[in-house]
Amino acid sequence: MESNRTRGLNHELSKLFNELWDADENRMKAGKDYRISLQGKAGYVPAGSNQARDSASYPLFQFVDEEKLRSRKTFATFISLLDNYEMDTGVAEVVTPEEIAENNTFLDAILETKVMKIAHDYLVRKNQAKPSRNDFKAQLYTIWFQLYSRAPGQGPDSCGFEHVFVGESKRGKEIMGLHNWVQFYLQEKRKTIDYKGYVGRQNKSRPDHDDQVLNLQFSWKEMVKPIGSSFIGVSPEFEFALYTVVFLTSQEKMTREVVRVEEYEMQIVVNRHGRYIGTAYPVLLSTNNPDLY
């Protein structure tokens, strides 16, 4: 079935995503704005297991220039959203007027960036977005922040933003989502995330400290994520732009677009939950099992 088959390289999206990469002025620079310590290679963990050998004695993030991070408007407004969600699916979310205002402030901030302007222009050309910025903002709000139910018979308990950027749990036993480096860093700092090691690519014995797409293994509040994937250092608007473009240019339930961005050949995977984003993440193509994400 087309929706689950790996496609050939999408040259059009590769070109667009490299434009977005080059336009990402808010991206944090490896070795200067942050430092990571990859340490050991993670071991195999069967799906559903919460036991993992720890191949990393220290946190992944050795240093992040938080002053610089929080001085950049899109990062600052993004960070303010991270504590607005209930971790467990099956527990109805309650969205306050203050949280709605924070969501809108974040969208206003990213819509001012070159990255989102390029993505918006592309989607307008593809007839997938209206030219009006306000219309596009409303479209983004629906796609990313509209609540829906992941657990049958339950009230609205999730949204695309929560799953992808914040992370959530399934019955307190399984980590779902959490594909964002800022949330990973902040949870590491609170000692709720324990980095277990990197998951290597077949064509590269180990990642480099300046790699900006990584496959990781970690535990979060006693649950283990056997493989989690994340961009490192990129701005929130960069990820929003990538995933929104893939979501709006495909009607499939599961879309895997193969792209080359900088040195990284990867799939951008986006799962559709009706009119909303279910999940979205990058997969380095040499990873053995993309379905563990």
Curated annotation (Swiss-Prot):
Membrane-spanning intervals of the chain: none
UniProt-listed Enzyme Commission number(s): 4.6.1.-
Major location (coarse): nucleus
Cofactor(s) the protein requires to work: Mn(2+)
UniProt keywords, alphabetically: Endonuclease, Hydrolase, Lyase, Manganese, Metal-binding, Nuclease, Nucleus, RNA-binding
UniProt key word Transit peptide: no
GO-annotated cellular components: nucleus
UniProt-annotated location(s): Nucleus
Catalytic reaction equation(s): uridylyl-uridylyl-ribonucleotide-RNA = a 3'-end uridylyl-2',3'-cyclophospho-uridine-RNA + a 5'-end dephospho-ribonucleoside-RNA
Any one GO molecular-function label of the UniProt entry: RNA endonuclease activity
PANTHER family xref list: PLACENTAL PROTEIN 11-RELATED, URIDYLATE-SPECIFIC ENDORIBONUCLEASE
Assembly with partners or alone: Monomer.
Annotated protein name in UniProt: Poly(U)-specific endoribonuclease
Annotated organism of origin: Xenopus tropicalis
